[in-house]
């Protein structure tokens, strides 16, 4: 490959002056016209090390990543999304959420091999959102702030001050943040209780004498870099909750390159493969095509599972569903 891009790590970029001028005459503050909507505001939350203030509950949402969708649906605010861009695999969502997504205009689904969205600044700004979910390379928080648009990112994906020790509590904390932003605290707490019950139920299905090791990998389909997930990722607490020992438990990075030799040396009993979109069989073939892969215990014993990235990363309600998938696949 000509470049090594870590899956779901996003870099910031500056907003050009021309793009700012396009919107200079457009003051988009739909919520401010509704006195009821502004009750209890302004509110300030911390995200990616920055303090972000909302003068009213956001009314025009732009989705640049799929991770926040389940939370927005459960809070009853997904219908405020005016546009979306990127990959929104149907497997992530229930029928009710899919119905809401179908009503949201999709501007583009173009992503590169590592899941990075390809979209222009002008296209996003033209939607006149008051809140964008997800940071991409050419749309940083600061660049959007120049045209009075707020941005929220999942803590693990922050380009600055990322969450380096995510766990299931991180999921609940982010839901409370969304509840505060949208003035939906009761809905957030109800959803948190549901998720806590689901985590407890999954853990109850783990065998008491479970002692297997596991690795979570992100292979590059078609050949190239293979990435692994350490303790700085949600993969680590997810494996622990499923009863497994992460073979990369001594690596504090979230995601990092791993060689075939390293993988063979650690030889996990179970391998979980992550991907952004496409055919799971291609992802598994990318693992099997690695030099020496046929000697891996997980491969020899057919203990390999493939699931979509957001079922593990970042720490969102989808990580709970991913835990359920893992327990269902590997526990008796």
Per-region residue spans from a language model:
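Bacterial Sec-exported substrate-binding components of ABC uptake systems
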Residues: 2-74, 181-217, 267, 275, ...
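Solvent-exposed, polar/charged alpha-helical surfaces in well-ordered, non-transmembrane soluble domains
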Residues: 70-73, 122-126, 142-145, 169-176, ...
């Amino acid at each position: 490959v000509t470049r090594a891009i870590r899956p779901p790590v996003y870099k910031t970029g500056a907003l050009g002056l021309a793009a700012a001028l396009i919107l200079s005459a457009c003051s988009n503050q739909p919520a401010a016209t509704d006195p009821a909507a502004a009750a209890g505001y302004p509110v300030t939350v911390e995200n990616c090390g920055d303090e972000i203030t909302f003068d009213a509950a956001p009314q025009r949402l732009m989705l640049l990543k799929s991770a926040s969708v389940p939370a927005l649906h459960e809070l009853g605010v997904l219908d405020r999304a005016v546009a979306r861009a990127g990959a929104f695999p149907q497997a992530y969502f229930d029928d009710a959420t899919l119905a809401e997504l179908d009503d949201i205009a999709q501007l583009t689904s173009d992503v590169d091999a590592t899941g990075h969205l390809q979209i222009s600044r002008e296209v996003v700004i033209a939607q006149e959102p008051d809140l964008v979910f997800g940071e991409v390379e050419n749309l940083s928080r600061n660049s959007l702030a120049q045209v009075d648009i707020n941005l929220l990112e999942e803590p693990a994906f922050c380009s600055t001050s990322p969450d380096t020790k995510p766990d299931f509590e991180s999921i609940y904390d982010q839901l409370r943040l969304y509840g505060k932003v949208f003035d939906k605290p009761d809905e957030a707490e109800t959803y948190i209780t549901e998720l806590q019950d689901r985590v407890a139920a999954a853990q109850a299905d783990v065998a008491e004498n479970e002692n297997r090791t596991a690795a979570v990998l992100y292979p590059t389909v078609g050949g190239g870099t293979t990435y692994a997930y350490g303790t700085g990722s949600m993969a680590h607490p997810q494996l622990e909750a499923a009863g497994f020992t992460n073979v990369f438990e001594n690596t504090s990075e979230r995601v990092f390159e791993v060689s075939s030799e390293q993988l063979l040396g650690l030889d996990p009993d179970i391998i979980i493969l992550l991907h952004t979109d496409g055919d799971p069989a291609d992802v598994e073939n990318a693992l099997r095509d690695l030099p020496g892969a046929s000697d891996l215990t997980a491969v020899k014993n057919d203990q390999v599972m493939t699931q979509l990235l957001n079922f593990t990363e970042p720490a969102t309600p989808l990580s709970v569903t991913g835990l359920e998938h893992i327990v269902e696949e590997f526990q008796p």
